[in-house]
Amino acid sequence: MDKIYDFVIIGAGSAGCVLANRLSADPNTRVCIMEAGIKDKDPRIHIPIGFAFFGPNNPVSWNYETVPQKEFEEVTVAEPAAEVVDTAGGVHSFKQEIKEHRRGAQPRGKTLGGSSSINAMLYVRGHRWDYDHWASLGNEGWSYDEILKYFKKSEHNEMFDDEFHGQGGPLNVSKIRHENDPTKDFVEAGSKLYKHNEDFNGGEQEGIGFYQTTQKDGKRCSTAKAYLVPALDRPNLTVITEANVNKILIDDQKATGVEYIDAEGESHNISAVSYTHLRAHETL
């Protein structure tokens, strides 16, 4: 029998975790969030420097790559064996190198929290001009002044408490815990040459300074940590990991649920009474 929910969220990434928290806040709403990756238990996720040690076969990333980049060096991608027959009938084997320009890594999170669980934890909002430009194109509600309240609602900023920042939100924002001497020298020199900016997420982004980070008590504060973990005890929220969605079920031009494959290769269906939300990866 299909399991039935009011909302099914496909993808427990940055947006999916927020949706799961907000929707399940209503105890009368049944919410299911599905993630293709594993749970975010790997300590390399939570220790800030850990993301640098995942390597090329990252178990919590989709491990995407770019097309070959002409600016990169050439590398051998294959060495197919071939045989030739000489005029005397002798058979000779040889390998022929096939080379192409190296591809660039494009890691994207495949775990609870999505890319917020494997990124560099830099907290930098978009530029005011971009939001105002979107609004000028007819997207009502997207100007900087209109969305600022949502930035403030989402964060708990340990550094600033002013008209640009919020307190008491789920996403913890803190200063870098270790400002090493070479970086201090760089910031000092850049500030003298141009100008210093203590807060890239304040009145303006231009200038030189230290980043703010999505960390709490020296650990990563992913959207899974900020939004999903506080909601896990809600009886109306179901989290399914290692669930590869195979098909969105459509009935009369309406998404009514999903078909997915679990970690053992078994197929299951889930029905959504109200809404099926698909979170696709954003790659620019």
Question: Can you describe what each PLM-predicted range is?
Answer:
Residues 1-282:
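N-terminal redox-cofactor-binding region of secreted/periplasmic oxidoreductases
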